[in-house]
Structures are given as structure tokens and as C-alpha cells.
Amino acid sequence: RSTSLLLSENIKQRLDRFDVEKPFDVMAVIDGSTLPNKMPLVDVQATIKNSNLSTTIGEFTNASLKAHFSNQVNLSEQRSDANSRFTFTGCSAIWEKIPLKSDSFNIANLEHPIMDCDLHTAFELAQLNELLGASTIEFKNGHCNADIKYHGVVMKSDTAPASIFGTVNLDNAAIEYTPRNLTFTDCSGSLVFDDKDFIVKQLKAHSGSTSLLMNGSVKNLTSLIDKSPEKLILNLNISSPKIVLSDFISFLSKRVITPAADAKKNSTKKLLKLATQVDKILNDCSVELQINADRLIYKKFNADKVAATLLLTDKMVALKNVLVAHAGGTLQLNGSLTEGPVQNMVRLAARMTNVDVTKTLTAFDNFGQDGIVDKNLKGRLSADINISGLINTKAELDPNSLRGIVDLRIKDGELINFEPVKKISQTAFKNRDFSNIRFADLTDKLEITGSEIKVNRMEIQSSVLTMFVEGIYDVEKGTDLEIQIPLSNLSKRGEDFELKNKGVKSKTGMSINLRARTGEDGKAKITWDPFKHALKKKEKEVRDDKSPANSIKVIRKK
């Protein structure tokens, strides 16, 4: 402190915030008048060896450095704070058990201080947990080494953006993202600071049985980190030989936001601010993922050649341009998952093209119904699907919440031991085998409301007979379907019969009308329906839905 008396009052006040435990060597040159309003040339050199330093950012132990101060860096300009500079070389110390080294550390222009420094360190990542007390991220294990160069302002009042260059290397790290209870293990790779940008380079990680390789960036990190962290976007390209979706099921749970824990007691407000910034960035920033995977697995579902874009915000996961190869065909998908208080809202627009319908039913567990299952149906399915519903944290769909439309087409189709169709032979055409029937292209628009599926008039040209089906299929409340069988079916069909659709509006002539309804035992019953009760019931429900009274009710609900 006695040395600081040689300096101007402004600089002295700043230096007096620092304290050196042991005596150290100082050489000072003062040249010029020390009278009021005069400023002599001041040139000070100091050497500190293996001492402890007390600073505004904590205690540094076993510190060694060489320091130099001059108040006339540019000899052609007057001596002043603006023309002053501190230079530190050969710096080494231990801060909060973390070893630090710096080859060069300069602070110039003490009116509006600008810092230029390099920093080298290596430590165990778990040391950061107690030090920072961040609530969004926890380091379980792993090693870190960093080489950083910084150029920027020191004072809060100076708003010029900082430039950071350098690399942080992670080795065998385990990192938990606590809001989603998601842990990444075996993390190795580089985090690169490139001026204002932050770059993720060749970062390898595992989550469960999924291995990931990540490359990406955050643009303008240093510009937005304080002012608008919500504008930060982490763009990541992720590749994987196999993604197991169940490893990421925690994304269906509500994000848990907890206040930051207190940083280590002897840490400073600056560390608390850093922890708060880390939490705010991870909570507020958006993440855009470009995903490419050789294989995707979820329970019984398997897909190959996976390409997808995911946008993650604090309340939503958006799916864009998802394309996978599945069951010999393709599946395209766009949609969103929006976090709700209890369940999450899912909205999907999908297109299936030429997939094996048996494999697809198996993969999706028969879509939660047991009316027609994978063992009953063969063929190639193409479909346009627009659907919404609620999903819980276990990825289980609430069937009563489903709303949507499915436009489907099945080529080369076969019905195998489908009980409702087999029962037709108990009522009509008793001498025909309904256990295995082939049919022409099957097309229809299905309207889904909860467990109810409205089947619009559908033509089935099969190897056994022609029939037209329409009505309601409902595994919970009961099925009620109208089955029209034209009498042109009276002649049996041979192996060479051409399966060709005539159209749902084609003339059918005289017909037999049957009704398929769910009985009290829960099984389908086929009965004669000469007066078309099933169809009349359906038409009445349509009229009721379109009635003015119902329209008024809808308006009032809004």
C-alpha cells in the first residue's frame, strides 16, 4: 500500500482494493514535479513470488507475477490516466483450488479501462458446482483445460462488446441438465470462443444407449448475453448411428425451474452474477437441432435414414421436415409438442408413403385399438394424417383427446381372419370363405373424435364380394356400421377376378343391407338392416351437428 502512494489518487484507490500478504520487490522511477496540478512521470516495476493476493474477485494463493506500471505509455502524449497502463507477465496462482496461468495481462487507458489477457487453466469440472451454484447444469465428473484470450472493457459503465478467443477442451465429462433431468456422459470435445461467437466442435456424448456427435454455434453470444439472452439461438448439427427416443423421454415432463443455489460462501457477487447468467441463458435461449441418424428406435418402432429439424424453446418442441424410412416406405412429419400444466398438447401433420401396413401397426402398437390389428391386415399403406391430442410424461396418448382426419389408401390389401367380416357369412353368403380375402385399392377419409372413428362411405372390392361400408367405429362407446352388399355378388368370384373399384357413388342396384354393431358382450354382431337404421342414425347425427342450436352453442363457447 505504501507503493500506491506514488500514484495518482484515482489509481491509488483502485490498487488499494488489492492486498499482498508477503513483502515484494518494487522499483519506482518518479521524474518531474509533484506539486499540485503537476503529474510527474511514474514508472513502477514489481515482482511478487509465492504470495497470497486478496482481490475483488476472491483470494489467490501461491501467486507469482511481474508487474509494470507507466503513466506515459505513449511518449508523444501527456501523462494521464488515459495514457497509463498496467502490464503483468509470468502470472501464476491458485484461485478456489483452480490453477491459473497468464503469460500476458494488460490493462490500458485507466479512464475507460481495456483489458487484454490470456488465461490457461486445467481442473476437474465438479469443482465448478460449489463455486458457481448454477441451478440448470451440474457437472458430475470429467476434466477441463482451457486456453482463452480476452479483449474488452472492465467497467460496467463501458458497453463496448468484448472479444473472446480460445478453446475449452472437455474430457470424459458427465453433465446433467437439471430442468429436464437429462444426463450426458462420456462428453469429450471442444468449446471454441471465436470473437463474439461460441462454437461447439466435435463434441461426443452419450445419453443412455444413444451416442451423439455434435457441432454447432451460438452467434453474437457476447453481444446478447447481458442484453437479450432470449434472442440467443444454439444451432447444433447432431449425428448418431442410433437414437433411442426413450433416452429423451424426460422432454415430455414439465421443465423444472429452480432458483440458483448460493455459490460458495467466499465467492463474490461477480460469481453469483455468472451463475445467474448461465441459468438465464440455458432457460431463455432457443435450441435448433439438425438431426441425422442411421437408425431411430422407440419401443417397437424402427426407422432408418432419419433426418429432422427440432426447435426447442422453454415451452415447446417443434418438429420440422422430419423424414424417415420406415417399413419399406417413408414417413414425413411436421408438428409440435406444447407443454401443459398436466399433459402436453401434440399436433402432427404426417404423410406415410407405401409403408407395410402390418409392420406399421406393429410399430405403433395397433394405435391403441384392438379392432383391426397387425395380424389381420396386409398391404401397402399411404396416408395423410392431421391429428392432435394430449400426451402424458410417459409418452402415452389420451385416446379421448384425439381429434383429426386421416386420408388413407391401402394397395395390395388382404384381410386375414378379421372377425367382423367373417361374421358376415353367418348372416349372408354362408358358403363363402371370409377368412382370407384380397381387396382392390382401399381409400377413405376417417374422421377421428376421441375414441370414435367416423368411416365415410368406403368401397371394398374384394376377392369374395363387393361391399360398401360407412358409419361409426368406436372401441369404447360401441361400433355402428352400415354394410351394403349389392346382389351382383351372388355369383362366386374365381382366382382370375379383377379387383377394380367402381367408385363409392357408382350404381349398385338391388342390395342386401347389414348392420355391424357392438353387442353387450363387447363383440361385433352382424344383423339384417333392410331399413338402413345405421345409416339413418348417422344422417340424423350429421343434421344435429349442423342445426342452428348447435351453432349457437359453439358461438357462445367462444
Model-identified regions with their sequence ranges:
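Extended serine/threonine-enriched, polar tracts that run as long, contiguous segments within proteins
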Residues: 448-455, 459-466, 470, 474-476
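Membrane-proximal interfacial segments on either side of biological membranes
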Residues: 1-93, 98-196, 210-438, 465, ...
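Active-site-adjacent structural elements in folded domains
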Residues: 293, 441, 454
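Generic long, charged, amphipathic alpha-helical segments
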Residues: 439-446, 451
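Short secondary-structure capping micro-motifs at structural edges
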Residues: 394, 443, 456-457
